[in-house]
Amino acid sequence: MSAFENARKFFDACESPAGWEGCKEYVVDGAPFTAQSEPLVDVTTVQAYCDWMAGFGTVTAPGATYDLHTSGYDENTKTAMFFATYHATHTGEGGPVPPTGKETHSHYVYFLTMNDDDKVEKMVKVWNAPWAMKELGWM
């Protein structure tokens, strides 16, 4: 399996949301996660992010979906990129306020740096969290 194929499998598992159990075979243990987004400030590993997504997509906004618009892979930097829109409605517990019934359609980008074993060794998420939080009625 190629690095890009594994990156795609990780992306799909993370967004489905399969949680860490569904993602860990594609990720190096302890792989760092970064995002300059308010809700994710304390999330520092890919494992923690996968679990955060699973909680959001099964408890806070069950049934959330995504549309993948484009993806690519840079062989020189071993980096996969995925640009998508996340669709979610706040119908469950777990947000900063009781369920609002409001929805978001929020763009985001993942950058996944792969190692020589074709596993994710670092993840960066670019996401305008305030946009999503406003749409969900959280701000």
Predicted regions and their residues:
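C-terminal and inter-domain tail/linker signature
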Residues: M1-M139
